[in-house]
Amino acid sequence: MFLEYSKLSNSLNLNSKSHTSASNEESGSHHDHHHSSDEHNGSFDPHIWLNPELTKQIAEVIYQQLTIQYPALKSQFKQNLDDFVSQLSIAEQKIANQFGAQKPLSIYTFHQAFTHFAEHYGLHIEGTITRTPEARPGAKHLSELSKEIQQKSKICLVKEPNFKAPYINSIASETEVVFTTADPLATTIENSPKGYIDFIHSIADSFYQCFE
């Protein structure tokens, strides 16, 4: 079930840096990842499902909408919601424990997809390779980014499996780089009741490789 953005955004407490249309994350369904130019201006990050707390709010909105459309199934929807929130809370704590003892590290991502995840778990993303994944970044941006990275002794660079960007390897030639890959689209995650739990663990495991 997909909800109109206007209905969802009015129902969510989006106190972080960005807003977006939402998909049914409770069922682990995937979404269309087309980005308009407006979506990548400033600090916009539409990937709100990467913050588990916002995902709980999304699940609550979905529950409310489902009970309106199918009132006879309200008790089953409520049980599903409670189970999902409980499982997600357990996953959140496990992930928080993963990152809790790690020393600060400069993290760069391919594009602005992981802001919500990083903020939720206290990780610091210092920069992105490109604002929009569909277009190659400009030479000026790559040059400035390369100079910035060269001043650091070690960074972690988070790639994405759906986009090839060979220029990534050249911008940090004189810096120790830990490469990892994270998929904000959950393209390899099975669409199942625990799909979102598996998904958020996969993102956490990818970022944890930065510290290994």
Can you describe what each PLM-predicted range is?
Residues 1-212:
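Extracytoplasmic metal-acquisition and chelation regions
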